[in-house]
A protein has these predicted regions:
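Acidic glycine-/aspartate-rich tracts in secreted/extracellular proteins
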Residues: 62-64, 86-88, 107-110, 289-292, ...
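Long, contiguous C-terminal flanking segments immediately downstream of a protein's structured core
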Residues: 41-42, 54, 286-392
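Right-handed parallel beta-helix
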Residues: 100-105, 126-137, 154-167, 179-197, ...
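N-terminal secretory signal peptides that target proteins for export/translocation
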Residues: 1-9
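Acidic Gly/Asp/Thr-rich repetitive segments characteristic of extracellular carbohydrate-active
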Residues: 35-81
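Bacterial N-terminal signal peptides
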Residues: 12-25
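Boundary at the C-terminal end of the N-terminal hydrophobic targeting segment
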Residues: 28-33
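Extracellular beta-strand-rich solenoid/capping regions of secreted or surface-exposed proteins
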Residues: 70-77, 88-104, 111-132, 137-156, ...
């Protein structure tokens, strides 16, 4: 039993009895819960996933059938999925994540698990932990305009950790209008440039947002557009805690920090926030690459209108931003290059959208060259190696 417990602890599947980081606007239940796993941070840090349920083993790399990952996800009840094998799982259709589930990719031997050819979908799942999984969507088996490597919206209680997503037809990884969400230490890279989308050349990173959503310590690279695009409250999703907020604008709260953006191409890069809401952009690192046109861009403030899904209550609304501590390598004074790198819509000024937003405490690092290097090496989807190139 002690040997089993040691093994589980090495995978991060048990929770140490430690005091955790400070809380803000948390319910009594959240305040007394343990983190999802050691190192879980942000708004999704108290997700339980499969804790307390059965353990299901993935014993082969087949798309379906007994012992496959799809079979494991189809099992009823609360569950933690572990892997006895490693390698490529060649999907034959979209893979739906089930509720009350932990997918513990770090348990796979060798170089871990890679999902290929179809989307990892969170549209039917609440209370989910996914760690150390790679998704390589591509256009090899299927081309459609909604083909993300992974995505989910209108859900609650999700945390993604040390995953790697790439090769999408639409966005690489889109998560917005979710309640209590974290994406941390993930790679979001290499959206396909012209894979057959009906709009032509694409290469989009993702739409990010949520009603208490954290995106921290992620690496975004080699994409033309939506790096990321902040969703804002433009869809007026009502799945927020109505005891805390009066409307979806108040509830739209996004913390975006300690991320590294590289080579965001000649498209829009980072932009968004239409329909209102609150966005923190703190201690991020921007490094222009050979394909980058606007090399000192931090973000662009967008307003809600008919062209971006704005609903009638919110036309002309923009989010309020707290922008601080960002590092832009191409700027003449790169440190704290914050509002200097913000492009404003013509009807707004920085004074109109500046804000200070308290959010749950997470580990905060200064954006230095050493941070960029550590990010590129650490945000890997294989627990056996920290090299980004091995995350393919």
């Amino acid at each position: 039993m002690e040997m089993k417990n040691k093994l589980l602890r090495s995978w991060g599947l048990t929770i140490p009895m430690t005091l955790f980081l400070g809380v803000f606007n948390l319910s009594p239940i959240q305040a007394q819960d343990a983190p999802a796993f050691p190192g879980a941070e942000g708004h999704g840090r108290y997700v339980k996933g499969g804790r307390g349920g059965k353990v299901i083993h993935v014993t082969n790399l087949n798309d379906s059938g007994t012992g496959s990952l799809r079979w494991a996800l189809s099992q009823s009840g609360t569950k933690t999925i572990v892997f006895d094998v490693s390698g490529y799982i060649d999907l034959k259709s979209q893979l739906n994540v089930s509720s009350n589930t932990t997918i513990a990719g770090q348990t796979a031997p060798g170089d871990g698990i890679t999902l290929r050819y179809y989307t990892l979908y969170f549209g039917k799942s609440d209370n989910v932990i996914v760690r150390f999984i790679r998704c390589r969507r591509s256009q090899v088996k299927d081309v459609n305009d909604g083909a993300d490597a992974t995505w989910g919206r209108n859900r609650k209680n999700i945390i993604l950790d040390h995953c790697s997503f790439s090769w999408s037809i639409d966005e690489v990884a889109s998560f917005y209008d979710n309640l209590n969400f974290t994406m941390q230490w993930c790679n979001v890279t290499e959206a396909l440039a012209n894979p057959g989308h009906s709009k032509g050349a694409h290469s989009f990173g993702g739409i990010w947002g949520g009603k208490n959503a954290s995106f921290h310590h992620n690496f975004l690279a080699h994409m033309q557009n939506r790096v990321p695009r902040f969703n804002g409250a433009r869809y007026n999703w009502d799945g927020y805690d109505k005891t805390l907020y009066e409307n979806s604008i108040q509830a739209e709260r996004v913390d975006f920090r300690n991320c590294v953006m590289y080579n965001w191409g000649n498209g829009n890069g980072c932009y968004g926030g239409p329909g209102g809401g609150y966005i923190n952009m703190i201690n991020n690192y921007y490094k222009a690459g050979p394909g980058t046109s606007n090399k000192t861009r931090v973000t662009q403030v967008s307003v809600s209108d008919a062209s971006n899904g704005g609903k009638n209550p919110f036309p002309g609304y923009a989010s309020r931003y707290y922008i601080n501590g960002n590092y832009v390598t191409a700027a003449s004074s790169p440190k704290n290059y914050d509002w200097q790198g913000v492009i404003m819509t013509p009807v707004y000024t920085p004074l109109m959208v500046k804000n200070t937003l308290p959010i749950p405490i997470i580990t905060t690092e200064k954006t230095k060259h050493t941070r960029r290097t550590q990010m590129a090496l650490t945000a890997s989807a294989s627990s056996s190696t920290n090299q980004l190139t091995r995350a393919r």
